[in-house]
A protein has these predicted regions:
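Radical SAM/AdoMet-radical enzyme domain recognition
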Residues: 58-183
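N-terminal pre-core extensions flanking Radical SAM catalytic domains
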Residues: 1-57
Length: 183
């Protein structure tokens, strides 16, 4: 039995090798399915300097052009995409057009529009328009159990501010009976 499994395993590896390296393989001629989710890097600016992130080393800061962002969103929907993430290397709440991006994603028909944030800028003034635009979830990257750890990880003493913002978002969501994930 062991020898049979070894042979099947070896044959499987040989078949994979042939598919990968043989010129007549269909591996490189087939088109993979369009992804279910797209992530738009709407900006690459951040208000924190987390020790694990490459962002503090970026020497050029920019934002994604609105027309390009909306066109990419449209292409995603046209190709069967269902989820839209509005973040990547930057802090989404540094982007003044964030509510517009969320609203456009929902208008186009994305089932799930979300963002990740360090939470320091997710103030009621900035978060309310994003929530009201239809954001399906806001994920907080707190990365710490207490104030001291937070400062060590994030490079700033914003722990109290982040927890206040998180609490406000929970309260607003619950008071308005909004179906939105907060993580």
């Amino acid at each position: 039995m062991l020898d049979k499994n070894k042979n099947e395993w070896a044959e499987s590896l040989e078949n994979r090798r042939k598919m990968t390296f043989d010129a007549d393989s269909t591996l490189f001629t087939s088109v993979p399915p369009f992804p279910r989710e797209i992530t738009l890097d709407i900006n690459n600016r951040c208000n924190h300097k987390c020790f694990f992130c490459a962002n503090p080393k970026i020497d050029h800061y920019d934002s994604l052009d609105t027309d390009i962002a909306f066109d990419l969103m449209k292409q995603g929907i046209e190709n069967g995409c269902t989820d839209l993430a509005l973040q990547a290397t930057g802090e989404p709440f540094m982007e003044k057009r964030l509510p517009d991006f969320v609203a456009e994603g929902k208008r186009l028909g994305y089932e799930y529009v979300y963002l990740n944030t360090n939470g320091a800028l997710a103030t009621p003034k900035r978060a309310k328009p994003v929530i009201d635009a239809g954001c399906d979830s806001i994920k907080f990257s707190i990365n710490a159990n207490n104030k001291k750890e937070f400062e060590e990880v994030h490079g700033y003493d914003d722990f109290d501010k982040v927890t206040e913002n998180l609490k406000w978002i929970f309260e607003y969501r619950n008071s308005q009976k909004i179906k939105m994930g907060v993580y």
